[in-house]
Amino acid sequence: MLDPNLLRNEPDAVAEKLARRGFKLDVDKLRALEERRKVLQVQTENLQAERNSRSKSIGQAKARGEDIEPLRLEVNKLGEELDQAKTELELLLAEIRDIALAIPNTPDDSVPVGKDENDNVEVKRWGTPREFDFEVRDHVTLGEMHAGLDFAAAVKLTGARFVVMKGQIAHLHRALAQFMLDLHTEQHGYSETYVPYLVNHDTLYGTGQLPKFAGDLFHTRPLDEEAESSNYALIPTAEVPLTNLVRDEIIDEDDLPIKLTAHSPCFRSEAGSYGRDTRGLIRMHQFDKVEMVQIVRPEVSMDALEEMTGHAEKVLELLGLPYRRMALCTGDMGFGATKTFDLEVWVPAQNTYREISSCSNVGDFQARRMQARCRTKADKKTRLVHTLNGSGLAVGRALVAVMENYQQADGRIEIPEVLRPYMKGQQYIG
């Protein structure tokens, strides 16, 4: 959520920044609502003061033996007017809040201006795509060769965009996740965290999935609609529970940064992606991801974004997978991001780079929703923290990249050296 003071006092400046990302802020409506809020606020305060004064007069008149009935009727009338004004003010504030919750974050001035993914800017490349002297197989074909990817079984069990992994492919998938967790905890300073895969609506509001993206989530529907679990949804990413761990907290600045990582399944409806990436593991309703989250002081958040992106890059480099870093343009960034870097890994069968990590600085956008604050021991005044999140990495897409980049002419898959300790020293699948 944006700073309400900015929306009140500098709506034109906010509108200009939001226009860079293709969002039209209705400044006239905001101004009209703000003027009405001021009127109602003053009216409510005046009515409250008048009622208090008249109530005090009742006691004084009673002490003098005067007839208090006219005063009592006047106080009752003032009370009714006050209740009506309060109700109107509450409804207006709710309308303003609903509008504010639907407004995306403003882009940082360093973000390239653009309309969509075609306007993203390549920042760097690492590694050279391998040249094959045989016909490249995609990961689906390789998975079927090794009886490791069974999409038909998943359709029978659930439906489209799910997979059953088996045998050595399932083992490789697990090895990737374990390698990522070990790297982030042992070398990058993150604390491993296990989180619930179901969260309540307050948690989803905190990180910005609600109210705008309710359709992208899988919601629980218990038989008893009054049950607490009717307020649950499956997590679209571990960012959601990890970041909300600091909701309604005041953190000593000496304890920052807080760096957390978690391996979890992620659940997404993929609304709006009908017909895209229907083959294979690229776009699934359920997929595993190792997530990184940082909670930092505001003045260091851009440095933290560079650090976090570097942590995701290190995973790819140790796996020997060619990639490129893309600075997302204003029109392609996520709802809550003020700046985002995507990492795209080389996928030989598609002869292109595909997203495998997205690292974002969210600024104080989530912290304001969550009321996550920090302060120094010497200063009682609090301020909002900045939050960052990043994929370190999407495990299924990493599996795709390893299978395709390390395939051999005979169909075997070479296991990257850094993964062999997790595969009992095995060098090849097949």
UniProtKB/Swiss-Prot annotation:
Q: Name one Pfam family in it.
A: tRNA-synt_2b
Organism superkingdom: Bacteria
Q: Name one GO biological process term.
A: seryl-tRNA aminoacylation
What reaction does this catalyse? tRNA(Ser) + L-serine + ATP = L-seryl-tRNA(Ser) + AMP + diphosphate + H(+); tRNA(Sec) + L-serine + ATP = L-seryl-tRNA(Sec) + AMP + diphosphate + H(+)
Q: How does it assemble?
A: Homodimer. The tRNA molecule binds across the dimer.
Print the domain comment field. Answer: Consists of two distinct domains, a catalytic core and a N-terminal extension that is involved in tRNA binding.
Q: What is this protein called?
A: Serine--tRNA ligase
Supply the source organism for this entry.
Enterobacter sp. (strain 638)
